[in-house]
Amino acid sequence: MSRRTRCEDLDELHYQDTDSDVPEQRDSKCKVKWTHEEDEQLRALVRQFGQQDWKFLASHFPNRTDQQCQYRWLRVLNPDLVKGPWTKEEDQKVIELVKKYGTKQWTLIAKHLKGRLGKQCRERWHNHLNPEVKKSCWTEEEDRIICEAHKVLGNRWAEIAKMLPGRTDNAVKNHWNSTIKRKVDTGGFLSESKDCKPPVYLLLELEDKDGLQSAQPTEGQGSLLTNWPSVPPTIKEEENSEEELAAATTSKEQEPIGTDLDAVRTPEPLEEFPKREDQEGSPPETSLPYKWVVEAANLLIPAVGSSLSEALDLIESDPDAWCDLSKFDLPEEPSAEDSINNSLVQLQASHQQQVLPPRQPSALVPSVTEYRLDGHTISDLSRSSRGELIPISPSTEVGGSGIGTPPSVLKRQRKRRVALSPVTENSTSLSFLDSCNSLTPKSTPVKTLPFSPSQFLNFWNKQDTLELESPSLTSTPVCSQKVVVTTPLHRDKTPLHQKHAAFVTPDQKYSMDNTPHTPTPFKNALEKYGPLKPLPQTPHLEEDLKEVLRSEAGIELIIEDDIRPEKQKRKPGLRRSPIKKVRKSLALDIVDEDVKLMMSTLPKSLSLPTTAPSNSSSLTLSGIKEDNSLLNQGFLQAKPEKAAVAQKPRSHFTTPAPMSSAWKTVACGGTRDQLFMQEKARQLLGRLKPSHTSRTLILS
């Protein structure tokens, strides 16, 4: 029975009718249903302005677009639209047009039927006029299939209808809502369906990761399979609880290899699938969908397809290697291609099995394999109150023979490095296999963080700030904490091999690494003299500083020690050290001489004692320094006056001495040169014409 998909006829989308009128419109302003007032307004506008400009008509509706208005008129409000029952003439016309144009050109067929849409013609054909549609009464077998399929698929009526040849999805839905649902709710249908009837198996396909989709029925084979094997693998389920589902798959003892292979090959009696694959030709594995057989009794069993048959052939070729489940390990994040209906079971097995040489099935010792399922897997498997079987695929390697390529879900388990304690290293009884088994968790592994995330938040405090600003020095400090500006770095010109005659512990980096390095020529030249070290200043520091200031800033640095002859008359024992501080040379030479001269003129009673605090001496020096900075040396001719002023501190409350006439004359511009310059300036300003923006300067 051919079915039409939703996107077969694109030009018919303009004439489809829905409740909201805008299900396929992505740019719609409003997805609410049309009101009666809107319908009346649209009728009046179409009657007044016609159907030419739908944008103009949509401008009268604040929440409607032009497409919404057009769809509403053509599918619902158009008076020429026929919504009544179909006549015999219309049915006969549809049958003739379908024979002529096929079941795809519904828009073209609707043009031959006045007042009918393409959607109406399509539904009339598929639901009533199609000769393949059954119109007979529903049988008990069909009711049982619908009930069991509804438990698995839910309200997916199109897929359920594919399991019943001759029944449409609309008919199945109506029959469920009218008859079967009432029986299921009352419990009468369940008692009738358990009367020793074989279970129903539903063939489903997983195509392109789109979830469960039922297979298309073909000639000679339907989707309903009643001749499934007499003893299929089942799971006893009394209550659909996660604990019982986990317990059903938790413990399972391995049988000998013969019985193990028989259990895997149980779906073999289904002979219709290999025949179908042989008839149609085996497509490549990439395009072959996954096939599953859903038992109505709540199981999901993999059907025998080409991929499963290839896996069985590989297992038969080398059963010893394929049955060693200790080589299998599931990845943490499976890919999307390997996920079945967006849920993949993550298995972790702890194996206690001795490794035996291959090709010895009789010597194989049975062992116990445990499987653990996490909560998400159990919830996915128990969805719709039905459990599912979990398929297990073989490993990537086939006993070293490398035959074929098994599924990529399983990978070879990586060897783990085990850090043994000294006691364990000396013991010879512990094997590598036992150590791996001891690492296998006995419950669902949960990765715990070795730290708390809150350790990285709010960790900064005042103590850390102080430690960063002034960290405590170790026994071998790498560098000084504060760089002294006046202490430059000099490179020692002595080669390293001539510096130390005694033995020096070599650097660990270079003692351990004997491989030749290829430093640059500049590094080669610098490594000869060693690293930079702070060395004491040389006696030529002042000369170098004067040369730099003279060349760059044009400043001539004059040091008083070289000018004044009194310093050369001192005794050799009282001479200064040739190494001088730069700040003394720049600022304190002149002040030092004046202080010494003043201190020599002061009486002994006023001289400062040697035990005076340092702040008083600094006060005296700063005051004299300020005096020298304010006055030019040309005004410091009266040395006895300065000494006399310094002698005044005998009485602390006396008034200061009045200003001398000579000082007043110089300070107030009363000298002859100053008066001459003032007169010249007055004459120059008098010649200038006053302007509106200029200021008036009044000279008295």
Swiss-Prot record:
<feature type="cross-link" description="Glycyl lysine isopeptide (Lys-Gly) (interchain with G-Cter in SUMO2)">
    <location>
        <position position="482"/>
    </location>
</feature>
<feature type="cross-link" description="Glycyl lysine isopeptide (Lys-Gly) (interchain with G-Cter in SUMO2)">
    <location>
        <position position="584"/>
    </location>
</feature>
<protein>
    <recommendedName>
        <fullName>Myb-related protein B</fullName>
    </recommendedName>
</protein>
<dbReference type="GO" id="GO:0005634">
    <property type="term" value="C:nucleus"/>
</dbReference>
<feature type="cross-link" description="Glycyl lysine isopeptide (Lys-Gly) (interchain with G-Cter in SUMO2)">
    <location>
        <position position="596"/>
    </location>
</feature>
<feature type="cross-link" description="Glycyl lysine isopeptide (Lys-Gly) (interchain with G-Cter in SUMO2)">
    <location>
        <position position="104"/>
    </location>
</feature>
<feature type="cross-link" description="Glycyl lysine isopeptide (Lys-Gly) (interchain with G-Cter in SUMO2)">
    <location>
        <position position="447"/>
    </location>
</feature>
<feature type="cross-link" description="Glycyl lysine isopeptide (Lys-Gly) (interchain with G-Cter in SUMO2)">
    <location>
        <position position="194"/>
    </location>
</feature>
<feature type="region of interest" description="Disordered">
    <location>
        <begin position="391"/>
        <end position="412"/>
    </location>
</feature>
<feature type="modified residue" description="Phosphoserine">
    <location>
        <position position="282"/>
    </location>
</feature>
<dbReference type="Pfam" id="PF13921">
    <property type="entry name" value="Myb_DNA-bind_6"/>
</dbReference>
<dbReference type="GO" id="GO:0000978">
    <property type="term" value="F:RNA polymerase II cis-regulatory region sequence-specific DNA binding"/>
</dbReference>
<keyword id="KW-0539">Nucleus</keyword>
<feature type="cross-link" description="Glycyl lysine isopeptide (Lys-Gly) (interchain with G-Cter in SUMO2)">
    <location>
        <position position="411"/>
    </location>
</feature>
<dbReference type="GO" id="GO:0090307">
    <property type="term" value="P:mitotic spindle assembly"/>
</dbReference>
<feature type="modified residue" description="Phosphothreonine; by CDK2">
    <location>
        <position position="487"/>
    </location>
</feature>
<comment type="function">
    <text>Transcription factor involved in the regulation of cell survival, proliferation, and differentiation. Transactivates the expression of the CLU gene.</text>
</comment>
<dbReference type="GO" id="GO:0045944">
    <property type="term" value="P:positive regulation of transcription by RNA polymerase II"/>
</dbReference>
<feature type="cross-link" description="Glycyl lysine isopeptide (Lys-Gly) (interchain with G-Cter in SUMO2)">
    <location>
        <position position="523"/>
    </location>
</feature>
<feature type="cross-link" description="Glycyl lysine isopeptide (Lys-Gly) (interchain with G-Cter in SUMO2)">
    <location>
        <position position="639"/>
    </location>
</feature>
<feature type="modified residue" description="Phosphoserine">
    <location>
        <position position="393"/>
    </location>
</feature>
<feature type="modified residue" description="Phosphothreonine">
    <location>
        <position position="505"/>
    </location>
</feature>
<dbReference type="GO" id="GO:1990837">
    <property type="term" value="F:sequence-specific double-stranded DNA binding"/>
</dbReference>
<dbReference type="InterPro" id="IPR050560">
    <property type="entry name" value="MYB_TF"/>
</dbReference>
<keyword id="KW-0805">Transcription regulation</keyword>
<feature type="domain" description="HTH myb-type 3">
    <location>
        <begin position="134"/>
        <end position="184"/>
    </location>
</feature>
<feature type="cross-link" description="Glycyl lysine isopeptide (Lys-Gly) (interchain with G-Cter in SUMO2)">
    <location>
        <position position="546"/>
    </location>
</feature>
<dbReference type="GO" id="GO:0001228">
    <property type="term" value="F:DNA-binding transcription activator activity, RNA polymerase II-specific"/>
</dbReference>
<dbReference type="GO" id="GO:0005829">
    <property type="term" value="C:cytosol"/>
</dbReference>
<feature type="cross-link" description="Glycyl lysine isopeptide (Lys-Gly) (interchain with G-Cter in SUMO2)">
    <location>
        <position position="533"/>
    </location>
</feature>
<feature type="modified residue" description="Phosphothreonine">
    <location>
        <position position="266"/>
    </location>
</feature>
<feature type="cross-link" description="Glycyl lysine isopeptide (Lys-Gly) (interchain with G-Cter in SUMO2)">
    <location>
        <position position="648"/>
    </location>
</feature>
<feature type="cross-link" description="Glycyl lysine isopeptide (Lys-Gly) (interchain with G-Cter in SUMO2)">
    <location>
        <position position="499"/>
    </location>
</feature>
<keyword id="KW-0597">Phosphoprotein</keyword>
<dbReference type="InterPro" id="IPR009057">
    <property type="entry name" value="Homeodomain-like_sf"/>
</dbReference>
<dbReference type="InterPro" id="IPR015395">
    <property type="entry name" value="C-myb_C"/>
</dbReference>
<dbReference type="GO" id="GO:1990830">
    <property type="term" value="P:cellular response to leukemia inhibitory factor"/>
</dbReference>
<feature type="modified residue" description="Phosphothreonine; by CDK2">
    <location>
        <position position="440"/>
    </location>
</feature>
<feature type="modified residue" description="Phosphothreonine; by CDK2">
    <location>
        <position position="494"/>
    </location>
</feature>
<feature type="cross-link" description="Glycyl lysine isopeptide (Lys-Gly) (interchain with G-Cter in SUMO2)">
    <location>
        <position position="509"/>
    </location>
</feature>
<feature type="modified residue" description="Phosphothreonine; by CDK2">
    <location>
        <position position="520"/>
    </location>
</feature>
<feature type="DNA-binding region" description="H-T-H motif">
    <location>
        <begin position="54"/>
        <end position="77"/>
    </location>
</feature>
